[in-house]
Amino acid sequence: MLRFPHVCGLCLLLKYWQILALAPFRTSEPMVARCQRWMTLIAVFRWLLLTSMAPFVLWKSAAMYEATNVRHSMVFKTIALATMTGDVCISLALLGNHLWNRRELANLVNDLARLHRRRRLSWWSTLFLWLKLLLSLYDLLCSVPFLKGAGGRLPWSQLVAYGVQLYFQHVASVYGNGIFGGILLMLECYNQLEREEPTNLARLLQKEYSWLRLIQRFVKLFQLGIFLLVLGSFVNIMVNIYAFMSYYVSLHGVPLTISNNCLVLAIQLYAVILAAHLCQVRSAKLRKKCLQLEYVPEGLTQEQAMASTPFPVLTPTGNVKFRILGVFILDNSFWLFLVSYAMNFIVVILQTSFEHINHGEI
């Protein structure tokens, strides 16, 4: 497989993507990812198998709530089933999108691997990447208490359905980790360029142009997946907030499982948004730095360059924007929009719940 010249988790992420069929290609030395026909056929068969199993998985997963000792309301069961359906659909869409764009994905992975040979992740970036990987592992291990408590009472068909459901749930989490790792790598490139002395301005502009093209390819390839990731994570957070507030108002307690799940989802989503925001900030700083240096081509004075050279040659190409499907830009302002929407949602839930209490409905 591809060997990144640093112990940073990117190699593990790539391997994990291949195991979960998010990277339907074969990797080998030296630093080459290739699409092969037999790998494509296996990926297509796996996707068709998972698609055909999806209704069975949802049916059996919904029946698992009857096997527990906890009494769930019909509203809670409906929300849980809708959340599971969303996870399944998003995971299948991610797998299908990568299968359809496997050649572009392989080329992008090759470019990122070559980039990482020259620009290694810093130890801070490595630390944050591993923390996010461990957070995904913690999210997966949260299902262990349920299996210990109700696993013995469940038939084998429901256990299989629960395992496949965990696979669908983990695909989105691992996908987000891959997006986070790729953005961290490109962010590290901007950080190192910002620290370098501008001895050759033409080379600096060339690097700025190459980073911009790479990020544009990255956003174009993953924009559908990022949109689904943000949508699915935000909906799951809203559902967990509803379950948390409903439990708190009716039973006057704090459900640790629900609160932990909501916190993990929020941290994972914000990590991706923050990395994209910092990447855009570093790109803007690099562009401003290039403009302040007043680059003049060799053999021309500044007056001659201003008079005879087209404007785009004298300036950087533009700012990096993580514009997702033309709907939103992945930055801190978008995160503040999500937070404000969530706060309004909490207020509506509390108001509705207290009105029901006053009318004796709870």
From Swiss-Prot:
<feature type="topological domain" description="Cytoplasmic">
    <location>
        <begin position="1"/>
        <end position="38"/>
    </location>
</feature>
<feature type="topological domain" description="Extracellular">
    <location>
        <begin position="355"/>
        <end position="362"/>
    </location>
</feature>
<protein>
    <recommendedName>
        <fullName>Putative gustatory receptor 89a</fullName>
    </recommendedName>
</protein>
<feature type="topological domain" description="Cytoplasmic">
    <location>
        <begin position="188"/>
        <end position="223"/>
    </location>
</feature>
<dbReference type="GO" id="GO:0030424">
    <property type="term" value="C:axon"/>
</dbReference>
<feature type="topological domain" description="Cytoplasmic">
    <location>
        <begin position="96"/>
        <end position="126"/>
    </location>
</feature>
<dbReference type="GO" id="GO:0008527">
    <property type="term" value="F:taste receptor activity"/>
</dbReference>
<feature type="topological domain" description="Cytoplasmic">
    <location>
        <begin position="277"/>
        <end position="333"/>
    </location>
</feature>
<feature type="transmembrane region" description="Helical; Name=4">
    <location>
        <begin position="167"/>
        <end position="187"/>
    </location>
</feature>
<dbReference type="GO" id="GO:0005886">
    <property type="term" value="C:plasma membrane"/>
</dbReference>
<feature type="topological domain" description="Extracellular">
    <location>
        <begin position="60"/>
        <end position="74"/>
    </location>
</feature>
<dbReference type="Pfam" id="PF08395">
    <property type="entry name" value="7tm_7"/>
</dbReference>
<dbReference type="GO" id="GO:0043025">
    <property type="term" value="C:neuronal cell body"/>
</dbReference>
<dbReference type="GO" id="GO:0007165">
    <property type="term" value="P:signal transduction"/>
</dbReference>
<feature type="transmembrane region" description="Helical; Name=3">
    <location>
        <begin position="127"/>
        <end position="147"/>
    </location>
</feature>
<keyword id="KW-0472">Membrane</keyword>
<feature type="transmembrane region" description="Helical; Name=1">
    <location>
        <begin position="39"/>
        <end position="59"/>
    </location>
</feature>
<dbReference type="GO" id="GO:0016020">
    <property type="term" value="C:membrane"/>
</dbReference>
<keyword id="KW-0812">Transmembrane</keyword>
<keyword id="KW-1003">Cell membrane</keyword>
<feature type="topological domain" description="Extracellular">
    <location>
        <begin position="245"/>
        <end position="255"/>
    </location>
</feature>
<keyword id="KW-0807">Transducer</keyword>
<feature type="transmembrane region" description="Helical; Name=7">
    <location>
        <begin position="334"/>
        <end position="354"/>
    </location>
</feature>
<comment type="function">
    <text>Probable gustatory receptor which mediates acceptance or avoidance behavior, depending on its substrates.</text>
</comment>
<dbReference type="GO" id="GO:0034220">
    <property type="term" value="P:monoatomic ion transmembrane transport"/>
</dbReference>
<comment type="similarity">
    <text>Belongs to the insect chemoreceptor superfamily. Gustatory receptor (GR) family. Gr77a subfamily.</text>
</comment>
<dbReference type="GO" id="GO:0050912">
    <property type="term" value="P:detection of chemical stimulus involved in sensory perception of taste"/>
</dbReference>
<dbReference type="GO" id="GO:0015276">
    <property type="term" value="F:ligand-gated monoatomic ion channel activity"/>
</dbReference>
<keyword id="KW-0675">Receptor</keyword>
<feature type="transmembrane region" description="Helical; Name=2">
    <location>
        <begin position="75"/>
        <end position="95"/>
    </location>
</feature>
<feature type="transmembrane region" description="Helical; Name=6">
    <location>
        <begin position="256"/>
        <end position="276"/>
    </location>
</feature>
<keyword id="KW-1133">Transmembrane helix</keyword>
<dbReference type="GO" id="GO:0030425">
    <property type="term" value="C:dendrite"/>
</dbReference>
<feature type="transmembrane region" description="Helical; Name=5">
    <location>
        <begin position="224"/>
        <end position="244"/>
    </location>
</feature>
<dbReference type="InterPro" id="IPR013604">
    <property type="entry name" value="7TM_chemorcpt"/>
</dbReference>
<feature type="topological domain" description="Extracellular">
    <location>
        <begin position="148"/>
        <end position="166"/>
    </location>
</feature>
